[in-house]
């Protein structure tokens, strides 16, 4: 299966996941999902660094920025693996 197709399938499946299950994930895991999603869909971080007083925005920016140079397909694969490890297995 093509990576992009599998990635889109995972995104569609996540829309149907119980929000309680997602809220039980640690902040670190949620941040990993976020950074791989952004790298997969946008590519390298293209926004200016937020002030550190905006803790959540800065944490997201830092996480995404850490993937600079990662290929979008590689980020899709990581996202898919996170889905399989943290959503499917915990079902």
Segments predicted by a language model, with ranges:
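N-terminal alpha-helical modules
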Residues: 1-91
């Amino acid at each position: 299966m093509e990576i992009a197709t599998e990635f889109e399938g995972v995104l569609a499946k996540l829309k149907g996941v119980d929000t309680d299950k997602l809220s039980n994930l640690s902040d670190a895991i949620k941040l990993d999902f976020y950074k791989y999603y952004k790298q997969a869909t946008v590519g390298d971080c293209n926004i200016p660094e937020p002030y550190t007083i905006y803790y959540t925005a800065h944490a997201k920016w830092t996480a995404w920025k850490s993937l600079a140079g990662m290929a979008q397909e590689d980020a899709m694969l990581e996202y898919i693996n996170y889905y399989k490890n943290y959503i499917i297995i915990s079902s």
